[in-house]
Amino acid sequence: MATRKAAKTKANGPAHVPSGPSQVLAVVYGTLLLVYLRFIFSAGITHDPAKVMTQALPGLLLLHMGYCVVVLGNKPGRKIGTDVSTAMIAAALSVFFSVIIFGLLVLFGAPAISLVHNTFVCAMHMSILAVLPLFFTYHLDSKVWADIIAMRRPLDHVYAASVCTLIGAWLGAIPIPYDWDRPWQQWPITILAGAYLGYFVGTLGGIALELTKSLCSKTKKTE
């Protein structure tokens, strides 16, 4: 009975429980993404959102793949070539998944005709941020993905960052309808910013939750 319970707990837990150094690197990387977002704004996103977001895609993709290989794939005895291959597959799947996110954006009110390029490129940014690390960490395990979609998966910082990326993008849409006549209110600049900020907040929140669980577990063992 105890063996079955332990096996069930392991199956429902995160695929990769990060060590202290990995958690620190995850926070550093989240901060780096905020710097990258600042770079996107300084590149003139308010003048030509579609062009600047498109030009920023390769950099984001390389950054996220590197993060997956160096931080999320940092496991003893695992070859880096395996992690690189997994990251490439995850990247391809995230690009494909951007079509679904594009559909969701349109469903929630995104311009379906006039600003298709803007919407689709924004969907690609969101998919790379939210989906690529999930595919890298959890692969194509149907049971795990059923738990992720149903929000039954225990939160680690990878899952939390993905969820908060989508929440941040949703919250980012709030300023757009207001009649403030600000350049940054163009579609979908605030949604893009919300996604990046959400990723950072989710990473911090997920790590805080991991540390809390670890501390509680150690406390119970000492009692």
UniProtKB/Swiss-Prot annotation:
Pathway: Glycolipid biosynthesis; glycosylphosphatidylinositol-anchor biosynthesis. GO terms for cellular component: endoplasmic reticulum membrane. It is found in: Endoplasmic reticulum membrane. Its main location: endoplasmic reticulum. The chain crosses the membrane at residues 25-45, 52-72, 88-108, 120-140, 158-178, 189-209. GO terms for molecular function: mannose-ethanolamine phosphotransferase activity. Signal peptide: none annotated. Keywords: Endoplasmic reticulum, GPI-anchor biosynthesis, Membrane, Transmembrane, Transmembrane helix. It comes from the Eukaryota. It is a multi-pass membrane protein. One of its GO terms (biological process) is GPI anchor biosynthetic process. Acts in the GPI biosynthetic pathway between GlcNAc-PI synthesis and GPI transfer to protein. Belongs to the PIGF family. This is Glycosylphosphatidylinositol anchor biosynthesis protein 11. It comes from Yarrowia lipolytica (strain CLIB 122 / E 150). The lineage of its organism: Eukaryota, Fungi, Dikarya, Ascomycota, Saccharomycotina.
